[in-house]
Each structure stands twice: as C-alpha cells, then as structure tokens.
C-alpha cells in the first residue's frame, strides 16, 4: 500500500509538500530558539498611561502640601524664639505675669490643614479682687480677740475660786475657773492644767495685757505661774456696708462657698478660702468676720467680699 494512503486524512496534507504551510509563517524546529523570526509589536494601552499621569500628579500635590506645612512650622518656631529672647519688662524691671496665659497658635495657610488643633483654655473659678481705684473705704472694727497662754504649773481651782476676786467655779457645769477684770474688760478661763484662755479684748495689746494680769493674780495666790506660749487664736471684726443685700441671689450664685437658712439663722454664712475667713452677712448690710489670726486677714477678706455684696445690692 502506498505510504500516503496509510496516513490518516488529516495528516496527509502535512506530509505532502503541496500541503505545507504557506510561505511567511516560519516552521519551528527543536533546535530553533523560541521567538526567532517573530517581530515584536508594541501594545499601547491608554488606560495605563492615564493611571501613571494621575499618580505623578498626586505625588506633586503631596510634595507641595509638605513644603507648605514645613514653612508654617518654621514660621511658628521663629516667632516663639523671638518672643522668648526679648521678654517685655514693666517699670519695676520685672517681667509681668498674666492671670490667664494663652498658647501661641499660627493660622494655617489657605488650602491646608493645621498641624495641631488650637488648645482650649480651661475655665477656673477665681475670687474677684477689688482694684485699687474701687476700694471700699470701710475699715472693719475689731470686736473680740481670743488668746491662749500657758502658766506652766498645776493649779488648785478651788483655792483660786475661794481666794480670788471676781472668780467663780462650778465643776458640774464647767471644769474651769471663770475670772473677770475691768481693765481691760476681759474674761479668763483658767484650767487645772495651767492653760488659760483670755477673751473679750478689742486689740492685740489689750489681750496680752489682760493675760499678764490674770497670771499675776495666780502668782499672788502662791502658785509658781509663768507666762509661756502666748498666742492669738481668733479675731472677730464687724462693719456695715450701708445698703441692703439680696441674700437669696448671693447664695444661688456662690452656693459653693455660702449657705443660707433663714428659718435657722437670719444671716448668710460665707466661707472664704483665701484668706480662710468665715463671714456672716445680714440683709441689713451688717457683716461679721471671724477666724482670722492677724488683723490684716480681716481687712483682706472684707475687700474681697465688698464688690460681691455691691453686685447684690437691693434697689428699692
């Protein structure tokens, strides 16, 4: 049988020279490297070009924003450095201090976002201070001074009560001798431990003088009394602002420091923090100040409370 006839029909064209591939299409052999005789044709894609251009545009915008932010930071640093190197001084040569200092902030350039948010200044309650030009012109008067002293020895209270003038002793009611003198007009509480409390003086000098007189009386009765550790424990002052006061409005506004129970006590109790003074304020305008250790604390407390009372003046 013929060789061509033994091949299947679909393979006869490949074996015969007439059925060979047309010229122009290369036939690959096992020894021919892949891609030989093929002309590469570039593939152009418009989508890939547009993506590259968009990425380049975004990179340029980011670089511009970074340059603007660096310029803002540099300007802020230069301003802070100049202000720290040249502090302002007052007439006394000292740098003035503000009560509420504000942090320096720089406004961002148009089209950019700020580097740091502006800080919020916290609200803190402060005690209103009276300017020197608005002084009240009222000086509280001292009404009572309480002082203590140590006589430095044990005392027989029954002997003192029997032998001293103007002295009374009732141990069932109070475990101390109550003694009084006329000049200065004061009262003393004398305890068996040797401690003594003197009340009723109108000034610091009167309180010390009265305490020395009581100690001299105890010495004359045969006790080795001394005069040790004299100290003023409390001072009480009072004054009148000459106008009625709305206590209801005052207690609502300053409820953190004050209490007002007209059914229990007719006055408003105001507890000042600095100086540590307790004030009794009455609707008539009378003010009582207590709890001071020195006279200056009473004057300072009244100058602090006067502008507050002026703001709650009754208008009739």
Swiss-Prot record:
Keywords: DNA-binding, Nucleus, Repeat, Transcription, Transcription regulation. The keyword Iron-sulfur does not apply. One of its GO terms (molecular function) is RNA polymerase I core promoter sequence-specific DNA binding. Sequence repeats lie at residues 142-218, 232-309. Signal peptide: none annotated. It comes from the Eukaryota. Belongs to the TBP family. General transcription factor that functions at the core of the DNA-binding multiprotein factor TFIID. Binding of TFIID to the TATA box is the initial transcriptional step of the pre-initiation complex (PIC), playing a role in the activation of eukaryotic genes transcribed by RNA polymerase II. Component of a BRF2-containing transcription factor complex that regulates transcription mediated by RNA polymerase III. Component of the transcription factor SL1/TIF-IB complex, which is involved in the assembly of the PIC (pre-initiation complex) during RNA polymerase I-dependent transcription. This is TATA-box-binding protein.
């Amino acid at each position: 049988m013929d060789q061509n006839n033994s091949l299947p029909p679909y393979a006869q064209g490949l074996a015969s020279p007439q059925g060979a591939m047309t010229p122009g299409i290369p036939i690959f052999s096992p020894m021919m490297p892949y891609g030989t005789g093929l002309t590469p044709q570039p593939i152009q894609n418009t989508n890939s070009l547009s993506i590259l251009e968009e990425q380049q545009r975004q990179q340029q915008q980011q670089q511009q924003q970074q340059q603007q932010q660096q310029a803002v930071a540099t300007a802020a640093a230069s301003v802070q450095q100049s202000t720290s190197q040249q502090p302002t001084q007052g007439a006394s040569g000292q740098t003035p201090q503000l009560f509420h200092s504000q942090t320096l902030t720089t406004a961002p350039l148009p089209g950019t976002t700020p580097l740091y948010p502006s800080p919020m200044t916290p609200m803190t309650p402060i005690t209103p201070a009276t300017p020197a030009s608005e002084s009240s012109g009222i000086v509280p008067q001292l009404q009572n001074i309480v002082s203590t002293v140590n006589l430095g020895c044990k005392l027989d209270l029954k002997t003192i009560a029997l032998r001293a003038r103007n002295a009374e002793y009732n141990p069932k009611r109070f475990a101390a001798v109550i003694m009084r003198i006329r000049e200065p007009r004061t009262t003393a509480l004398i305890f068996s431990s040797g401690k003594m409390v003197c009340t009723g003086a109108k000034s610091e000098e009167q309180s010390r003088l009265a305490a020395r007189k009581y100690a001299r009386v105890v010495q004359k009765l045969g006790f080795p009394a001394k005069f040790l550790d004299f100290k003023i424990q409390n001072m009480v002052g009072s004054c009148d602002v000459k106008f009625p006061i709305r206590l209801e409005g005052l207690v609502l506004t300053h409820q953190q420091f004050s209490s007002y129970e007209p059914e229990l006590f007719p006055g408003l109790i105001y507890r000042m923090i600095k100086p540590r003074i307790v004030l009794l304020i009455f609707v008539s305008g009378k003010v009582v100040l207590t709890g001071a250790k020195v006279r200056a604390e009473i004057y300072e407390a009244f100058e602090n409370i006067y502008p507050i009372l002026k703001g709650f003046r009754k208008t009739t």
